[in-house]
């Protein structure tokens, strides 16, 4: 095959590559996009294809500062490749496509398909229509056509899965454009959610993450304010489901019945990611966050009382318009009081289309950077101190795939503790597969991981490990590896590695 017509076609079958940017909702949607394409006869391009697939799909994010620059830079990189290969197709979906529907094809006329957040199920049809009509297809739905979970899927993990319980958001945070792009909250019926989870468990999945822009508001669309706590308890009754997580909740909707369900349901993990955004009441009001510092710390206190070993993480924005030094000191105060295991910190930057972008009092970059560095230094210190408390504890880890970048050179494997802390452990003589469970003693703590340097105390082979082994064997003869444009995407870990819900990300 000449360099002029380089292609990743396999045996005459067209190949695809999906590149994902943004939150867990996009990761979940990308698994559906992959499933739709495989259902239509495409196969995944080999690992590291770098735009050489027959179809390249960008699932975009609209809330990162340079989201559009990144997209158009990547599209520009593909333009000469497509010029050499007329049969190649490029599709752009996700939040940026929903927002910039009218400009993408104008700025990148070599794009074949533009689709939004509400009609991902149309991708194969739009690709075929663009091929036949030889012109770009731009189709954006204004409301959800089908829950992503009802579409075919190509899950990135054999043992862990996302399960969408709702889409959209009813909040109006002034820094966030997500509600405008994903619409008002719409809840799935509990029976549909539980049926999907049971089907996943039957396939070997042992860990699920309940997913929504605001998971603990679940039930508002179906008229049941305790629907989320009931859903957690129902997950506890599913045989074979070992771990349940959820992301992301909103402090306004965090009620006592949810805390009780977390504490009383054994397979709901002792982990909570709850965005703070700011510790200042004045800034929270400007953000339109619907809670104040006292309310937030009160939830933390209740969670710690009910679940003493819970690992709590958060999102924080530094330098929101109008933030004073006193406001920032209030954020530092909450960080000291809450003692987060981890905090995902962001420097505020204008998001076009959001009220905050037009606010007075935009903070100079130098000031934002200085505050950001102080916050990161404080949180690093706290994360390390909290991790040191884990030394000497005996923990059950679910063995993870691809978590430890240095595992090969250190002869270690990696896994997740119940509270989602990352643990690197000594590789045992007995075969251990992703999805299996090992028991180890923690011997060392760093700010972002733990070590178990002694021998593994126990290895429990699981149905999840069986599922991984079966899938791995089946994949051996196929082209492998679609590059999702996120680091560490594939397994829902660490949650939220790239935050969703009410976060800025």
UniProtKB/Swiss-Prot annotation:
Q: In its keyword annotation, does this UniProt entry include Protein biosynthesis?
A: no
**Which of UniProt's keywords are assigned here?**
4Fe-4S, Cytoplasm, Iron, Iron-sulfur, Metal-binding, S-adenosyl-L-methionine, Transferase, tRNA processing
* Binding-site positions, [4Fe-4S] cluster 1: 23, 61, 95
* TRAM domain boundaries: 388-456
Which GO CC terms are listed, alphabetically? cytosol
| Name of the top EC class for this enzyme | transferase
Q: Please describe what happens when the gene is knocked out.
A: Insertion mutant accumulates lower amounts of moenomycin and is impaired in morphogenesis as compared to the parental strain. Mutant shows reduced level of thiomethylation at position 37 in the anticodon of tRNA.
Write out the GO MF terms: 4 iron, 4 sulfur cluster binding; metal ion binding; N6-isopentenyladenosine methylthiotransferase activity
Pfam short name (any one): UPF0004
What cofactor does this protein call for? Answer: [4Fe-4S] cluster
Q: Which SMART domains match?
A: Elp3
Reaction equations catalysed = N(6)-dimethylallyladenosine(37) in tRNA + (sulfur carrier)-SH + AH2 + 2 S-adenosyl-L-methionine = 2-methylsulfanyl-N(6)-dimethylallyladenosine(37) in tRNA + (sulfur carrier)-H + 5'-deoxyadenosine + L-methionine + A + S-adenosyl-L-homocysteine + 2 H(+)
Q: What is its main location?
A: cytoplasm
- The keyword Transmembrane helix is annotated on this UniProt entry: no
Q: Where in the cell?
A: Cytoplasm
Ranges for domain Radical SAM core: 155-386
Residue ranges of domain MTTase N-terminal in the record:
14-132
Write out the residues that bind [4Fe-4S] cluster 2: 169, 173, 176
EC?
2.8.4.3
Cofactor descriptive note = Binds 2 [4Fe-4S] clusters. One cluster is coordinated with 3 cysteines and an exchangeable S-adenosyl-L-methionine.
**What is known about its subunit structure?**
Monomer.
Q: Which family does this protein fall into?
A: Belongs to the methylthiotransferase family. MiaB subfamily.
The role this protein plays is: Catalyzes the methylthiolation of N6-(dimethylallyl)adenosine (i(6)A), leading to the formation of 2-methylthio-N6-(dimethylallyl)adenosine (ms(2)i(6)A) at position 37 in tRNAs that read codons beginning with uridine.
Q: What is this protein called?
A: tRNA-2-methylthio-N(6)-dimethylallyladenosine synthase
Gene name linked to the record: miaB
């Amino acid at each position: 095959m000449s360099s002029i017509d380089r292609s990743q076609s396999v045996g005459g079958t067209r190949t695809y590559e999906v590149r994902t940017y943004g939150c867990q909702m996009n990761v979940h949607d990308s698994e559906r996009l992959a499933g739709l394409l495989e259902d239509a006869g495409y196969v995944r391009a080999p690992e590291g294809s770098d735009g050489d697939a027959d179809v390249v799909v960008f699932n975009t994010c609209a809330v990162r500062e340079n989201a559009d620059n990144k997209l158009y830079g990547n599209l520009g990189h593909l333009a000469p490749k497509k010029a050499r290969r007329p049969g190649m197709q490029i599709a752009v979906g996700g939040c940026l496509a929903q927002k910039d529907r009218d400009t993408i094809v104008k700025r990148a006329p070599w794009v074949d398909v533009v689709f939004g957040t509400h009609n991902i199920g149309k991708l194969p049809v739009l690709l075929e229509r663009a091929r036949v009509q030889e012109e770009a297809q731009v189709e954006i739905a204004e409301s959800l056509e089908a829950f992503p979970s009802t579409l075919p899927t190509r899950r990135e993990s054999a043992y862990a899965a996302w399960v969408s319980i709702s889409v959209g958001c009813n909040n109006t945070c002034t820094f966030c454009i997500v509600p405008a792009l994903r619409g008002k909250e719409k809840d799935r019926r509990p029976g549909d959610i539980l049926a999907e989870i049971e089907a996943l468990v039957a396939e070997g999945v042992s860990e699920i993450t309940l997913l929504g822009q605001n998971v603990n508001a679940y039930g508002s669309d179906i008229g049941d304010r305790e629907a989320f706590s009931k859903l957690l308890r129902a997950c506890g009754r599913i045989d074979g489901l070992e771990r349940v997580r959820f992301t992301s909740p909103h402090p306004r909707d965090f009620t006592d019945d949810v805390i009780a369900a977390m504490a009383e349901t054994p397979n709901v993990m002792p982990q909570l990611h709850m965005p703070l955004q700011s510790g200042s009441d004045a800034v929270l009001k400007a953000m339109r966050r619907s809670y104040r510092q006292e309310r937030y710390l009160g939830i933390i206190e209740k969670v710690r009382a009910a679940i003493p070993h819970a690992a709590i993480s958060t999102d924080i924005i530094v330098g929101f318009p109008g933030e004073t030094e006193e406001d920032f000191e209030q954020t530092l105060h909450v960080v000291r009081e809450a003692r987060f295991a981890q905090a995902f910190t962001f420097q505020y930057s204008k998001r076009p289309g959001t009220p905050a972008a037009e606010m007075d009092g935009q903070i100079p970059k130098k000031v934002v950077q200085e505050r950001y560095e102080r916050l990161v230094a404080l949180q690093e210190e706290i994360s390390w101190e909290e991790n040191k408390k884990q030394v000497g504890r005996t923990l059950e880890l679910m063995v993870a795939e691809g978590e430890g970048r240095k595992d090969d050179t250190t002869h270690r494997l990696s896994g997740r503790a119940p509270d989602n802390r990352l643990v690197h452990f000594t590789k045992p003589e007995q075969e251990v597969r992703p999805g299996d469970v090992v028991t180890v003693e923690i011997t060392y703590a760093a700010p972002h991981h733990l070590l178990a340097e002694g021998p593994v105390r126990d290895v429990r082979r699981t149905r999840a490990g069986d599922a991984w082994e079966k899938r791995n064997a089946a994949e051996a003869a196929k082209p492998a590896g679609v590059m999702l444009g996120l680091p560490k995407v594939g397994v829902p870990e660490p949650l939220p590695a790239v935050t969703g819900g009410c976060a800025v990300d």
